[in-house]
């Protein structure tokens, strides 16, 4: 039995895609916190915050303690030309603070993240930045031709970047 099944079986009310705008700082007379959401106010004896980069927005005590940083990832898709498949996840370290990571998918595509050398010099692009709705422009093309540059046996492949996105952690 998975974790989700286990917690639902004991009555946990798991809310997903439900932004919380406020949590009461003191419980009511029955020991419940009021959790204000777009769906209404929920009552909870325990609240678990799973917010990563956005923690300080709900918990001001964490301002300056949890600092959001932005990164960039790409989805590389091989074409019909034969390529060597990757059977493991990889970290490619190019310097002390410069590395990329690759996660092969079952369909032969690859998730790759990194590109730090393209944006690290401009702190506003990544430090204390939660702008997930816009790409880091200076790194947007980093994954183009990545497999051809980095892996033997991929030089003649037509593997290309299908998608690029950014995220905060």
What would you call each of these model-derived segments?
Residues 1-45:
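Helical element adjacent to the flavin cofactor pocket in flavoenzyme catalytic cores
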Residues 2, 54-56, 91:
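Internal mixed beta-strand/loop scaffold within catalytic domains of large alpha/beta enzymes
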Residues 16, 31, 70-72, 98:
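Residues that flank catalytic or metal-binding motifs in active/ligand-binding sites
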Residues 37-85:
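Central helical "cap/lid" subdomain
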């Amino acid at each position: 039995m998975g974790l989700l099944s286990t917690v639902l079986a004991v009555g946990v009310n798991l809310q997903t895609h439900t932004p919380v705008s406020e949590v009461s700082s003191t419980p009511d007379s029955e020991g419940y916190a009021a959790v204000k959401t777009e769906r209404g106010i929920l009552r909870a004896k325990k609240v678990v915050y799973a917010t990563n980069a956005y923690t300080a927005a709900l918990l001001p005590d964490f301002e300056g303690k949890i600092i959001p940083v932005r990164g960039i990832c790409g989805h590389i898709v091989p074409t019909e030309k034969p390529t060597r498949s990757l059977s493991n996840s990889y970290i490619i370290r190019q310097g002390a603070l410069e590395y990329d990571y690759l996660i092969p998918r079952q369909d032969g595509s690859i998730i790759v993240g990194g590109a730090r050398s393209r944006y690290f010099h401009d702190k506003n692009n990544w430090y204390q930045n939660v702008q997930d709705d816009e790409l880091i422009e200076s790194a947007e093309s980093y994954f183009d031709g990545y497999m051809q540059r980095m892996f033997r046996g991929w030089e003649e492949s037509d593997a290309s970047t299908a998608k690029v996105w950014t995220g905060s952690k």
